Amino acid sequence: MDPVVVLVLCLSCLLLLSLWKQSHGGGKLPPGPTPLPILGNILQIDFKDISKSLQNLSKVYGNVFTVYMGMKPTVVMYGYEAVKEALVDLGEEFSGRNLSPINKKVNKGLGVIFSNGKRWKEIRRFSLMTLRNFGMGKRSIEDRVQEEARCLVEELRKTNGSPCDPTFILGAAPCNVICSVIFQNRFDYKDETFLNLMGKFNENFRILNSPWLQVCNIFPILMDYLPGTHKTVFENFDYVRNFVLEKTKEHQESLDINNPRDFIDCFLIKMKQEKHNQQSEFTIENLMATVTDVFAAGTETTSTTLRYGLLLLMKHPEVTAKVQEEIERVIGRHRSPCMQDRSRMPYTDATVHEIQRYINLVPNNVPHATTCNVKFRNYFIPKGTAVLTSLTSVLHDNQEFLKPDKFDPGHFLDASGNFKKSDYFMPFSTGKRVCMGEALARMELFLFLTAILQNFTLKPLVDPKDIDTTPLVSGARSCATLYQLSFIPA
């Protein structure tokens, strides 16, 4: 038989099998575009802006639909009601984490972000309790953030009002807070070890959000046989793991179980308490993975939000003026901002919320997975199915936010100028997998931004009306374009 005929028959069989699986096997998956054999729907997805592709598909197939990334189905929840129904109302059923091939190679399902089941529940519970209750012994986390805010201000003063790219400085501050929480001590901004650590994380974030890595996750065989930036990701993670391992060894040698100094000490003490438990999840491997997760989640996301936030404030000087007036009235010039100030600063609070809403940092959330067979509305979603929840569709909902594509702190203010909460505000996701570092990130954003605006006037290099705040969307996240500004001492 002609090889071409054989190939066509095989592809046809694969297509029929794919369609059969979509409509049988215990029920019916949500509707969606017809997948091609092997390729699935990847030709209908723009991997430079996945969120836009999902928006277009939702107009055709509704708020719950299925796309095939290669041969694997992914169910998409679009809009507030669908996202809430999945992540909150059916929180346990949708609390799994879809482990991509890249993540399988990097952390093997360890840690807290990409783990599942008993491991995830135990590590997450421990991490939350440690970060929440620790007050870190003698010093609260707020103390550490305030210290870093003062260091950030001093570092910005060293620019002497000259034009600068704020990317590094705004990345160093949240990274140092994590260092303080994890390792007890912060680093000098010019410390070579600190610079290397930040460099590895930043490079990995850039690569992991590239279209090439999205393709590698769909066709993992490419990683085994082709050169590419995925190799750099593995090398960088090895560097970070070795760094954490060295720090862990130092902690083991000086550990005082009655006086834990930081997160690593608390984890090591927990390991000692469970040393006779053969099924314990508290191992050196899980410690390294968890610390790496905390770094990854707590550094780049906050720094990107800060950098984008300053760009928006330069674009909208009328907003900046109102925030600075509120800072002057409530805090003044002679003390550092603290979290107690926030309740008396509704406009500033609304501005921080609006920055997060507008930039829509992680448009499609971190992928979830079903933990069991789920009947969702009139559909059947098998256990282990990947689930994407569109945060864009919630944060930019035009019923909740009157001008969703415009930057306007009024979205979070009532008619009297008081701060107004919104159930649609979920930049940290929602439900059982809500970002573990949400409280810390909110604290950092408020304290860092108020400290900067208390001490400096933001001076753009171009007219505010010419500033481009259009997000650069790449793979799984959005960020601001590179820019320079001057920090003029107030």
Curated annotation (Swiss-Prot):
Induction: P450 can be induced to high levels in liver and other tissues by various foreign compounds, including drugs, pesticides, and carcinogens. SUPFAM superfamilies: Cytochrome P450 (SSF48264). It is an enzyme of class 1 (oxidoreductase). Its cofactor is heme. One of its GO terms (cellular component) is endoplasmic reticulum membrane. The keyword Heme applies. One of its GO terms (molecular function) is oxidoreductase activity, acting on paired donors, with incorporation or reduction of molecular oxygen, reduced flavin or flavoprotein as one donor, and incorporation of one atom of oxygen. The keyword Transferase does not apply. It catalyses: an organic molecule + reduced [NADPH--hemoprotein reductase] + O2 = an alcohol + oxidized [NADPH--hemoprotein reductase] + H2O + H(+). Its EC number is 1.14.14.1. Gene3D superfamilies: Cytochrome P450. One of its GO terms (biological process) is organic acid metabolic process. PANTHER family: CYTOCHROME P450 2C18, CYTOCHROME P450 508A4-RELATED. Cytochromes P450 are a group of heme-thiolate monooxygenases. In liver microsomes, this enzyme is involved in an NADPH-dependent electron transport pathway. It oxidizes a variety of structurally unrelated compounds, including steroids, fatty acids, and xenobiotics. Belongs to the cytochrome P450 family. This is Cytochrome P450 2C14. The gene is CYP2C14.
